[in-house]
């Protein structure tokens, strides 16, 4: 096992490892040790957002390259005065390219409740959401809780008592520790296992489900996030700008087209080009 050097551990932004993103890109690029990705030269957008690609409050070295998922995010980033912004596409989109789908249409629904994290918690009525999902969805329901809520026994038991299959894709990692490099691998497998993906907020999982060829819908109480940053419009803007995804039934073709744009699925780089964009040499470690 090759241990990371101090330079590799400290010089790359820790968020580049979130959800196994760096590992997926290393695999796509054909790097010699994808389990130990080289240092990405820049900050890689680690989740879908309606801002400039950076999570609010993210420590960021001015002038560093910002590697974003879509042309739309790049335009917003430029509008905020950022430069050196490069569209690379979402790591999940590269994973889909590397993982051929079967012919199975999937069964039932996978539900992603809005979640909190180490720095912010969510307030809302999970039982109310459960009742709405049960009244709307047909077939078996899987509730996929984020690690934050999965560790809350009281919340997890609500979904278990409702008869839902309750799962968690793993821990996204934090400060270079405990990254589940197969997080998105497990998520893609679960999305393809189901016919529909739903959530009470528009989020990465909805876009991922659509890219994986699944129907998607956003409905229910969006809940409230502690000290939510409303700089870019928050939940009201989500509903206003992407109204096509809201409601119990949506048009797949329209929503799938939107998902491809948000994830940069039509702008993915080839392995050699992506290596150059990430600052990787073919040999692997620089």
Task: Label every model-predicted segment.
Residues 94-160:
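Conserved catalytic-core segment of nucleotide-activated headgroup transferases in glycan assembly
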Residues 60-66, 140-141, 193-197:
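Short active-site oxyanion
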Residues 1-96, 206:
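Active-site and donor-binding regions of nucleotide-sugar-utilizing enzymes
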Residues 67-70, 112-114, 144-148, 198-202, ...:
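Short His-Asn-centered micro-motif
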């Amino acid at each position: 096992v090759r241990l990371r050097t101090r330079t590799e551990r400290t010089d790359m932004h820790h968020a580049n490892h979130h959800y196994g993103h760096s590992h997926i890109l290393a695999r796509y690029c054909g790097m010699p040790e994808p389990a130990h990705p080289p240092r990405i030269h820049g900050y890689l957008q680690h989740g879908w957002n309606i801002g400039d690609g950076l999570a609010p409050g993210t420590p960021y070295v001015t002038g560093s390259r910002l590697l974003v998922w879509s042309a739309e995010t790049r335009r917003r980033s430029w509008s905020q005065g950022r430069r050196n912004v490069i569209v690379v596409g979402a790591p999940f989109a590269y994973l889909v390219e590397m993982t051929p789908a079967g012919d199975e249409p999937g069964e039932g629904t996978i539900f992603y409740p809005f979640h909190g994290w180490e720095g912010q918690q969510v307030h809302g009525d999970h039982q109310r959401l459960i009742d709405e999902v049960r009244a709307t969805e047909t077939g078996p329901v899987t509730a996929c809780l984020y690690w934050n809520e999965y560790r809350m026994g009281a919340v997890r038991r609500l979904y278990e008592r409702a008869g839902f299959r309750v799962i968690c894709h793993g821990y996204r990692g934090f400060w270079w520790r405990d990254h589940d490099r197969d997080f998105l691998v497990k998520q893609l497998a679960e999305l393809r296992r189901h016919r529909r993906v739903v959530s009470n907020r528009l989020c990465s999982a909805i876009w991922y489900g659509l890219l994986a060829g699944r129907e998607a819908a956003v409905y229910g109480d969006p809940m409230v996030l502690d000290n939510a940053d409303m700089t870019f419009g928050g939940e009201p803007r989500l509903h206003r700008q992407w109204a096509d995804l809201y409601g119990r039934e949506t048009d797949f073709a329209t929503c799938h087209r939107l998902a491809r744009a948000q994830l940069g699925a039509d702008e993915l780089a080839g392995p050699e080009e992506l290596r150059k964009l990430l600052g990787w040499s073919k040999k692997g470690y620089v």
